[in-house]
């Protein structure tokens, strides 16, 4: 019995970079804000933002608390982050408009 593979969120790295940029933090600053500090280097945050590595659930929960959005906003590619971060209260994200695709005949 192995682990079932799952599709990784495609926009997660983009959202994590947006959070850090909006908060005006360096990668080291983000590490400190996440409470990871000296245990990890800048490359750890860079790996998340470049989609080279997926953050663990506890790290995603910390991102969620820092910017006051529900965790599903981070991992659901159909949801966008709110314009203002951190949100004034927990935010459920902004649903992207669905694009109707033309069907092939």
Predicted region positions:
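Short, charged recognition helix plus adjacent turn
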Residues: 1-2, 6, 65, 72-105
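Flexible interhelical turns and helix-capping residues at alpha-helix boundaries
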Residues: 5, 20-23, 38, 52-53
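Recognition helix of helix-turn-helix/homeodomain-like DNA-binding domains
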Residues: 35-55
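DNA major-groove recognition helix of helix-turn-helix/homeodomain DNA-binding modules
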Residues: 52, 56-73
């Amino acid at each position: 019995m192995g682990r079932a593979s799952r599709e990784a969120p495609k926009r997660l790295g983009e959202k994590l970079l947006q959070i850090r940029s909006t908060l005006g933090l360096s990668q080291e600053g983000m590490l400190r804000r996440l409470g990871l500090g000296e245990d990890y280097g800048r490359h750890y945050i860079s790996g998340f933002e470049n989609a080279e590595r997926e953050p663990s659930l506890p790290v995603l929960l910390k991102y969620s608390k820092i910017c006051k959005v529900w965790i599903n906003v981070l991992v659901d590619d159909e949801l966008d982050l709110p314009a203002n971060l951190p949100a004034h209260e927990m935010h459920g994200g902004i649903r992207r408009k669905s694009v109707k695709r033309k069907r092939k005949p």
